[in-house]
Amino acid sequence: MSHFKIVFLTSLSLALVFELFNTISVPITSHLFISEYNGYKFGVFGWCKVDGSICSPIRMGYSLDDILLFNDNEYLHLPNHAKYALSKLLLVHVLSFVCVLVFWLFAILICIKWLNTSKSVLLFAVGWSMVTFMVSLLGFLIDVLMFASHVTWSSWLMLVSAFFVALSGILLCLMIRDLSYRRFVKLQGEVDVCVPMTEPRDPDELNEIWKKKTSKREIL
């Protein structure tokens, strides 16, 4: 069981770190970005020029007005202009990070109080792992939808994060099964019930058998 816990927590910790890489992308940090295209780096909360000289304000979604404020001769280009409105869907990255963080906190609580954790809490954690997996996978699909072949390794980490979340959910199901067996063995040890292998006979019948055996011994 200790090996299951180690792999369980390690998988979720890696998923949390990978989600963090996408969440703190440009313009929060200059080295992490989900796409690079036409001299610009794009992140969840905005964009920056490759040289870092100009960055957009930190907000959800991209806008042509950001560039026009700095230089009327430059325009912000995405792979497809129709995708400016879709840039607000990058909020899914933040939602995915929050979901993984909650799942990670659940994992720590479950591993610390393993034998005393109620079954309803464990089942809720399994359900939450499914939600977290779908949100993480959705974040990766949104990156591909917006930036196509221009996605960077940071976006691919979202797919890896979804894999680790799915692995953690499977391990949690195996741990619940093992916990149910441990509780059954513990309950069986506390309640010692003797079950007869055959149906007990009538007392009068047993007395007759005893008399016959004693009479045979007297004859001998």
UniProtKB/Swiss-Prot annotation:
Task: Note one Pfam family from the annotation.
Answer: SUR7
Keywords on this record? Cell membrane, Membrane, Transmembrane, Transmembrane helix
What the entry lists under InterPro entries is as follows: pH-response_reg_palI/RIM9, SUR7/Rim9-like_fungi
As for membrane topology, the entry says: Multi-pass membrane protein
Give me the segments passing through the membrane. 6-26, 90-110, 122-142, 156-176
Q: Which residues lie on this side of the membrane: Cytoplasmic?
A: 1-5, 111-121, 177-220
Where does the protein end up?
Cell membrane
Membrane-side (Extracellular) residue stretches: 27-89, 143-155
Q: Has the keyword Magnesium been applied to this entry?
A: no
GO cellular component terms, semicolon-separated: cell division site; growing cell tip; plasma membrane
Per the similarity annotation, which family is this?
Answer: Belongs to the palI/RIM9 family.
Q: What is the documented function of this protein?
A: Required for the proteolytic cleavage of the transcription factor RIM101 in response to alkaline ambient pH.
> Would you tell me the protein name for this molecule?
pH-response regulator palI/RIM9 homolog 1
User: What is the species listed in this Swiss-Prot or TrEMBL entry?
Assistant: Kluyveromyces lactis (strain ATCC 8585 / CBS 2359 / DSM 70799 / NBRC 1267 / NRRL Y-1140 / WM37) (Yeast)
Instruction: State the taxonomy lineage.
Output: Eukaryota, Fungi, Dikarya, Ascomycota, Saccharomycotina
